Amino acid sequence: GCIADAPPPAAGAFIEGPRRRDNSTIPRILHQTFKSCELRADEASLRETCTRVHNQEEGWRALLWTDTANRELVRRDYAASLRVYNGYDDHMKRVDSARLFQLHAYGGVYLDMDFACLRSLNAVLQSSDFLVAQQHPSSCTHRFYCPKWSIIANAFMAAPRAHPFTEFLIQRLRASAKKRLLHATGPGFLTAAVQAWRARGYSGVRVLPFCTMYGARWYLQHPCNRSSLDACARQLPATLTTSFWLGSWKKKAASEKLSRPDVSCLGAHA
């Protein structure tokens, strides 16, 4: 359901300091965020693909967070982060950071609103790791669109409640707050955090292949038609969810989008 204002109690939240996490796998909770409970047609139809696959009969709970509910979660359970959260110079920084508090407090799966769910995520959730995925396929060599460093996108993340890496991310928000969006809270921030975590010799973060969670790059035409997702599932047999890259910053970059379709995951097998 939609959380319009007050979020439900969060057993895993830290108020006066981090609490020991559950030794458990990722719970079946789907988190998504929108400015209000009133979704546009595009977002509503894509969200429905995910709530249909991940339903109550399968033990799932789908939460739609509003801006108001996100701020209330931070105010209530993460008061030490509230000043940074309120002080962001870009609302998208709040949107990006809110998903970290959701995952720390409740655990589960975070997906951007422009994802379609082609298959159940149940198989990948049998893990105690923090899960992320590559934003580009390993074969990507385009000099402009594929940086030398491999991007880990923050449009999909999954974690057990109170995972240590989620705490690590939250603790890094203050130091990065004044940076540009990409590196303050976005994919650059997440990529750097994964690198820093691993450089310290820590484990518990797993990076899934691009085709598993994204299925198409933002700067190429999507190979699937949104009105025929059954066909899309057949075209992308190794893909669990796929992003149609409908976010506002991606729309601004539409002029840079190439006309050819992304075929990197067509027929790919897990």
Regions found by a protein language model. Name each.
Residues 1-95, 113-270:
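Glycosyltransferase-associated regions of secretory-pathway enzymes
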Residues 96-108:
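Small-residue hinge/turn detector
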